[in-house]
Design a protein with these regions (language model features):
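Alpha-helical residues within the helix-turn-helix
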Residues: 13, 24, 53
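Short alpha-helical DNA-recognition segment
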Residues: 16-35
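DNA major-groove recognition helix of helix-turn-helix/homeodomain DNA-binding modules
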Residues: 46-61
Length: 72
């Protein structure tokens, strides 16, 4: 299974927001944010846009399809 690499945890730390606060802002659970940060879940396009909007950046700034992660 391939997952897209991301720097969501780094961006979240820069703005001093907890996983719960971010989850509430984009209408998902804290567990979803945790799974994305750990590379265990790829967000839907809708969620990716919501995250980018929250951080005021482009989707590509958070999610890097050039560095896919390989899960066994």
């Amino acid at each position: 299974m391939r997952l897209v690499d991301n720097d969501l945890d780094v961006r979240r730390a820069r703005v001093d927001v907890t996983q719960k606060e971010l989850a509430d802002a984009v209408n998902v659970t804290r567990q979803t944010i945790n799974a994305i940060e750990r590379g265990r879940y790829d967000p839907s396009l809708e969620l990716a846009f919501a995250l980018a909007d929250f951080f005021g950046c482009d989707i590509e700034d958070i999610f890097n399809p050039e560095t896919d992660l390989e899960l066994s």
